[in-house]
């Protein structure tokens, strides 16, 4: 099976390398020539356009920043739709709006091209070690056919429903992650402002009910002042905006999500849009006039 992979960013590059390690033949594309060179050195081939990739691959994976990027690559000039033969499958592993997934799928289906929306969670560390969580929407038979391909990059791969369901699930995930980071930031800022060592507070609570994967991943980053992006604030704002747009469409209320998105937008205005989303703690630190350190 020859696999196309478009998008070799923070997540896409290690994901593509895991496919190579699993023995898949890979053809890649990205706007960053250094990323392409790195993956070629690991054993991949390259092509200049999405159309060129689609002409030679049975299945194409996209890992791109947002809905417009996926639409352009899938449906635009020199896009997948221009090169793919009937029966080709697009697995979009980007985090985009559920409505966009459905629109892209409909356009591709008219040309005999199937699609799964399969966003991931776990950030760069899990992309590197191949233990991502993948949440997938689309035809169950297509999911079953390409389960092993997705599993080569993941610890868990779960079918969540029809096309778009994968991205609804990812939005739910992103809401939980954002609110967890906000709660952690409030708690550690409280401890610091009250004169208690936040590292000791973290060690004391991590084994109890307040403990979580988010707490263990992000509290050390805050205390070490390490905001190297595993997942950028800019991208989390995008996800929360998509969650709010989706909630408006279905009549759900997300007041905490709206509040945290406002905080992240304030941080972006302060120049932290490209920082890791754990830098949400900086919003609370600024208000309290403290810095959360070990």
From Swiss-Prot:
Keyword vocabulary terms for this entry: NAD, Oxidoreductase
Pathway in which the depicted protein is active: Carbohydrate acid metabolism; galactarate degradation; D-glycerate from galactarate: step 3/3
Pfam families in the cross-refs: NAD_binding_11 (PF14833), NAD_binding_2 (PF03446)
GO MF: 2-hydroxy-3-oxopropionate reductase activity; NAD binding; NADP binding
UniProt EC number: 1.1.1.60
The UniProt record lists the keyword Nucleotide-binding: no
Any Gene Ontology biological process: glyoxylate metabolic process
Superkingdom classification of source: Bacteria
InterPro entries named in the record: 3-OH-isobutyrate_DH-rel_CS, 6-PGluconate_DH-like_C_sf, 6PGD_dom2, 6PGDH_NADP-bd, HIBADH-like_NADP-bd, HIBADH-related, NAD(P)-bd_dom_sf, Tartro_sem_red
Enzyme class: oxidoreductase
Residues that, per the record, bind NAD(+): 4-18, 95, 238
Catalytic activity, as annotated: (R)-glycerate + NADP(+) = 2-hydroxy-3-oxopropanoate + NADPH + H(+); (R)-glycerate + NAD(+) = 2-hydroxy-3-oxopropanoate + NADH + H(+)
Inducers of expression: Induced by D-galactarate, D-glucarate and D-glycerate.
Residue positions of the active site: 170
Record has Oxidoreductase as a keyword: yes
Coiled coil residues, start to end: none
Function description: Catalyzes the reduction of tatronate semialdehyde to D-glycerate.
Family note: Belongs to the HIBADH-related family. 2-hydroxy-3-oxopropionate reductase subfamily.
Protein's UniProt name: 2-hydroxy-3-oxopropionate reductase
